[in-house]
């Protein structure tokens, strides 16, 4: 291999992405999981923890069963599942389908975990919703709990972290902004040991904010993610995310109805290049 003038780095790990090359984790098929694994490996990502969406319960179970049946060996290794929905706040649903949003449910989670063969490594929730704090108490020792799609204030987020939540899903996105009198989830995360996800595709977060975030959290607590959807690796056009139509132009993916950002169309390796080359974060 001729590598003069290049960097040689370990393979990346993407703990939060939905799809690529017209396939999605929520398809619930071996074909789609293998397509994700192949594309990611070809783009420098050697371990994947794809995310599910807020979708009908039967479809969620099918996605879990498909993951359980997948055999690693070709492409990136499937090392877990990030369960992004359905335990979120409707006010911050983003590109998630409102009709499938549910209150945090320990029994449902355990059934999904059984269907997945224990592969769920992250479960996301809005801590201000009914039953969420009790949910954290009951599952914190068996799965990482991530604060996501939330309207939580500083005190509520801090209490969730005290109870065992140790991760923040796509910091800044689908949560109240940092305010000097109402620091919210972002402030609570800063004052804790939580890991925080950043979508650094150049669309979701302004470069100045990314640089400030690295100053606040350091690279020891920041997890770069792609949050990519099925248009990644494809041409512009019409796609789908969580059962909703998505329009993709360049690297910008938005819901066709409403215009909300609907994941990214950028793989993790390209996100990392953007962070280093365009946002000037030291490599």
Task: Indicate where each model-derived feature is located.
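Conserved, mostly hydrophobic/aromatic
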Residues: 5, 16, 40, 83, ...
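His/Asp/Glu-enriched, well-ordered alpha-helical/loop segment
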Residues: 188-198, 214-226, 231-283
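Divalent metal-dependent hydrolysis catalytic cores, especially in the metallo-beta-lactamase
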Residues: 18, 34-63, 76-89, 116-128, ...
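A general structural motif
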Residues: 102, 127, 149-153, 175-182, ...
């Amino acid at each position: 291999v001729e590598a003069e003038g290049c960097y040689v780095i370990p393979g990346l790990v993407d703990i939060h992405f939905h799809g690529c090359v017209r396939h999605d984790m929520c398809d619930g098929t071996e074909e789609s999981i293998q397509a994700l694994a192949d594309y990611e490996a070809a783009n420098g990502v050697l371990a994947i923890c794809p995310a599910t969406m807020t979708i009908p319960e039967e479809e969620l179970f099918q996605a879990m069963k498909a993951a359980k049946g997948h055999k690693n060996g070709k492409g990136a290794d499937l090392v877990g599942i990030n369960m992004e929905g359905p335990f979120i706040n409707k006010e911050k649903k983003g590109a998630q389908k409102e009709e499938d949003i549910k209150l945090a449910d320990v029994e449902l989670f355990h059934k999904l975990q059984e269907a997945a063969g224990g592969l769920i490594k992250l479960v996301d929730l809005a801590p201000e919703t009914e039953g969420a704090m009790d949910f954290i108490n009951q599952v914190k020792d068996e799965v990482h709990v991530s604060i996501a799609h939330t309207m939580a204030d500083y005190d509520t987020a801090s209490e969730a972290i005290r109870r065992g939540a140790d991760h923040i899903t796509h910091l800044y996105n689908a949560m109240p902004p940092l305010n000097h009198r109402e620091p919210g989830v972002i402030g609570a995360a800063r004052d804790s040991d939580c890991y925080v996800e950043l979508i650094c595709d150049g669309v979701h977060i302004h470069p100045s904010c990314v640089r400030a975030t690295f100053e606040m959290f350091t690279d020891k607590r920041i997890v770069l993610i792609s949050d990519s959807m099925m248009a990644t690796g494809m041409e512009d056009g019409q796609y789908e995310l969580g059962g909703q139509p998505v329009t993709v132009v360049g690297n910008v993916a938005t819901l066709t109805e409403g215009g909300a950002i609907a994941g990214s169309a950028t793989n993790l390796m390209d996100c990392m290049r953007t962070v280093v080359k365009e946002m000037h974060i030291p490599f």
